[in-house]
């Protein structure tokens, strides 16, 4: 997946509607059509899980967030245990509804959330409203003692959501009033038989839901009476009154007129004035960055505390009113006050708002920098989530704990490594500068900071983590290591950093059972391949179906990668579970040069797959030249075998081993047999080696000679990678004509002459000192080296070998013309 460095995304957009669908739930296609908009999102599809982590990933993927105006509909199987409601959001377990809703509001813990719950026994969740932010709404659609009826729920959901999505400027608080009648009308269709009677499922918003359902039912059955209609009006008035108490503070000023319209029938005029006048007035005053009305605000402070459960200081902090906050603190306001029932500190609210000035002001008054919310979120965690390096520095300077983990499984370092923005990278570096930081702390799904930093291609953060000795081989919940994360971005630099710190290059993808080397070969990432092989990656590890990296390279037709793998010990004749080997796969794409290279390195030409050999599959796929080449090679091998069978040879000479003794006077290596005194002056000579084997061994001698020469040239001029590879490829082919024993005995002279010729033929640009050379020049160099060292030298035979040769002549009546059969063809 090469990828560009991930840039910082724009600020997340607020969703208008979020639809959470649990397992085994079939959402109505008409409902899904309504959600098919940029400002709406569906998580889960009745098959996949829709738990809080799945929601988090989807929100991050689409760069959206839950806000105070987001309507959240949850359709999931539910159950009631010990008077608590549970949702089935994943295939493996159930989640307590209260905790799930608290996690949903975690992205902005001071804002209300608006939830419709479509679940069996949903009425049990009504009391969970007490644990949510002030102003939150939970609308349940089934009584606590009844199971749900899917089609009717879909009908009610469709009616309810249509207005909310299609109507502009409709806040949750106004939608709440619209829902009173609309949802009750819809739920009259929600019927099923139970114990021989018809059970009507009802919306369980208020204690009056039973009487309300009867009212709606009678109206629909045309059994209206004056008393019934009055009862209906009273119900709506009471709902409006409840609405005023709960949500008056949260109405924006532009909603005031609409709000007054919907509350016009409230009988308690004083209550109406209090809600629509006093609270809105206080909110407006606290929003203005001045202190003209300070005394008036302080006078009514107790009333605000009694009704909202909070203090005016909390309101001014929330509204980022620096001047009024200073005035209240100087007046003696309690800097340790908390915000409502969720027990948020004022410092936490300041961090939520990225209010650096207010946060510093509170820290000067010695507020606790580590005071957590009920979910164990700390101010430092929020500062990291809001991507504010300045806030983080201020908190760390006051000894904020960098290792505190919230109930969401998040720590400051995890959060800063999750986010790819430059601000978050700066925060991560600030945290890593803290001597108490835990670099291997775990986040959701057992992600470590290093894994996350590698996923986000954060090179500086990765380096800082490695300097702090972060675990380079740590695995997440699914078994992936930092090296996998780095490879996902094809990040050569981060991959190199990890390997140099001891990352295991042979880790296996737990899902595909493939190595990173295999993946790199399959995707043609040459730089990563070179790094992995440099750090001793195993080139013969297979995937679940037995495929090796070499097979992947050959199937892609990549000659350069295949040659590199063979040079590093790849098994050329290994087959996968289908019987295919590297040659067979190379023949499928018709790369003649690749096929020739495999043959030169000793691939088995007769090894087949599914009843066919490589030459046959090449012809079948229309690659006549490849097929003809392989057929000629097979014929050549048969001729060699026939000659050998007509001229039976003596037993193959015993294996030679290297003597560690050095003759100082000649500085030559002596080779001896472990059981007899057979000595040869050409240690690598093999009497019976085939043509392809000879070439393979010769390449192993040639390549180091060329590399040594290039290094000498490199001291004077810069030889770039492309030129280096061209020199290697062309000269290797030219020097293959030289007998292997000549190569072995004349290494130093050959290196010196190659170096000299390369320097002479260089067409260097003096301005940039870059080495350049033409293909023709390389071929001419090869001819010169061959002229100097390519003459044929017969092996010098010892007495024992000569004796065997004489016996061979006597028994076969062969002439010297057959001597090459005995010695082996070059």
Curated annotation (Swiss-Prot):
Keyword Transit peptide: no
Keyword rRNA processing: no
Transmembrane segments: none
Pfam family, one: Ank_2
ANK repeats (start-end): 308-337, 342-371, 375-404, 445-474, 478-507, 512-541, 545-574, 578-607
Coiled coil segments of this chain: none
Keywords: ANK repeat, Repeat
Entry protein name: Putative ankyrin repeat protein RBE_0220
Species the sequence originates in: Rickettsia bellii (strain RML369-C)
Lineage: Bacteria, Pseudomonadati, Pseudomonadota, Alphaproteobacteria, Rickettsiales
């Amino acid at each position: 997946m090469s990828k560009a460095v991930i840039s910082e995304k724009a600020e997340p957009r607020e969703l208008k509607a979020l639809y959470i669908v649990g397992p085994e739930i079939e959402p109505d296609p008409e409902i899904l059509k309504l959600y098919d908009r940029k400002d709406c999102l569906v998580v889960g599809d009745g098959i996949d899980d829709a738990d809080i982590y799945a929601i988090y990933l989807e929100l991050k993927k689409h760069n959206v967030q839950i806000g105070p105006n987001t309507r959240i509909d949850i359709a999931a199987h539910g159950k009631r245990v010990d008077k608590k409601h549970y949702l089935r959001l994943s295939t493996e377990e159930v989640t307590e509804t209260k905790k799930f809703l608290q996690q949903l509001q975690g992205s902005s813990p001071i804002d209300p959330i608006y939830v419709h719950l479509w679940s069996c026994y949903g009425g049990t969740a009504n009391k969970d409203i007490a644990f949510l932010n002030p102003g939150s709404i939970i609308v349940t659609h089934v009584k606590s003692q009844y199971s749900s009826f899917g089609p009717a729920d879909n009908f009610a959901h469709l009616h309810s959501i249509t207005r909310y999505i299609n109507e502009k400027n409709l806040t949750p608080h106004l939608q709440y009033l619209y829902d009173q009648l609309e949802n009750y009308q819809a739920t009259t269709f929600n019927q099923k038989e139970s114990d021989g009677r018809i059970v009507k499922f009802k919306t369980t918003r208020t204690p009056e839901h039973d009487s309300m359902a009867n009212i709606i039912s009678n109206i629909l059955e045309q059994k209206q009476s004056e008393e019934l209609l009055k009862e209906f009006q009273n119900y709506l008035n009471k709902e409006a009154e409840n609405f005023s108490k709960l949500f008056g503070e949260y109405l924006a000023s532009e909603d005031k007129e609409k709000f007054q319209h919907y509350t016009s029938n409230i009988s308690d005029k004083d209550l109406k004035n209090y809600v629509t006048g006093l609270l809105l007035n206080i909110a407006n005053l606290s929003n203005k960055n001045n202190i003209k009305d300070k005394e008036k605000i302080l006078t009514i402070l107790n009333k605000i505390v009694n009704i909202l459960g909070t203090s005016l200081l909390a309101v001014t902090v929330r509204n980022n009113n620096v001047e009024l906050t200073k005035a209240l603190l100087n007046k003696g306001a309690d800097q340790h006050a908390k915000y409502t029932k969720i027990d948020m500190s004022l410092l936490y609210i300041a961090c939520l708002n990225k209010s650096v000035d207010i946060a510093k002001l509170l820290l000067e008054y010695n507020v606790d920098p580590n005071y957590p919310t009920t979910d164990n979120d700390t101010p430092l965690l929020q500062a990291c989530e809001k991507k504010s390096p300045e806030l983080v520095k201020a908190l760390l300077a006051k000894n904020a704990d960098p290792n505190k983990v919230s109930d969401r499984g998040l720590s400051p370092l995890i959060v800063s490594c999750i986010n790819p923005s430059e601000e978050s990278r700066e925060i991560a570096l600030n945290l890593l500068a803290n001597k108490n930081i835990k670099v291997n702390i775990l986040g959701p799904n057992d992600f470590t900071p290093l894994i996350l930093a590698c996923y986000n291609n954060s090179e500086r953060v990765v380096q800082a983590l490695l300097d702090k000795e972060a675990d380079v081989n740590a695995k997440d919940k699914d078994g992936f290591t930092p090296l996998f994360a780095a490879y996902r971005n094809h990040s050569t630099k981060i991959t190199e950093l990890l390997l140099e710190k001891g990352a295991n290059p042979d880790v296996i993808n737990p899902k595909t059972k493939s190595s990173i080397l295999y993946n790199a070969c399959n995707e043609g990432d040459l730089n990563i391949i070179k790094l992995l092989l440099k750090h001793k990656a195993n080139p013969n590890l297979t995937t679940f179906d037995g495929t090796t990296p070499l097979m992947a390279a050959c199937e892609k037709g990549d000659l350069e990668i295949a040659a590199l793998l063979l040079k590093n010990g790849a098994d050329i004749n290994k087959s996968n579970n289908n019987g295919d080997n590297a040659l067979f796969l190379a023949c499928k794409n018709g790369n003649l040069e690749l096929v020739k290279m495999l043959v030169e390195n000793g691939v088995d030409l007769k090894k087949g797959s599914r009843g066919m050999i490589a030459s046959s599959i090449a012809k079948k796929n229309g690659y006549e030249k490849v097929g003809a080449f392989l057929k000629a090679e097979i014929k050549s091998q048969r001729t060699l075998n026939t000659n050998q069978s007509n001229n039976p040879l003596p037993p193959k000479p015993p294996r030679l081993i290297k003597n560690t003794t050095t003759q100082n006077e000649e500085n030559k290596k002596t080779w001896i047999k472990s059981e007899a005194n057979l000595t040869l002056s050409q240690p690598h000579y093999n009497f019976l080696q085939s043509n392809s084997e000879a070439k393979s061994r010769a390449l192993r001698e040639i390549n180091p000679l060329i590399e040594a020469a290039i290094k000498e040239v490199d001291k004077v001029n810069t030889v770039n990678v492309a030129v280096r590879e061209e020199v290697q490829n062309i000269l290797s082919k030219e020097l293959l004509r030289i007998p292997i024993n000549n190569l072995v005995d004349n290494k130093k002279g050959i290196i010196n002459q190659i170096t000299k010729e390369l320097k002479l033929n260089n067409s260097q640009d003096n301005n940039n000192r870059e080495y350049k050379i033409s293909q023709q020049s390389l071929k001419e160099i090869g001819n010169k080296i061959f002229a100097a060292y390519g003459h044929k030298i017969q092996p010098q035979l010892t007495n024992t070998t000569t004796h065997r040769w004489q016996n061979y002549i006597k028994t076969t009546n062969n002439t010297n013309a057959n001597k090459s059969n005995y010695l082996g063809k070059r």
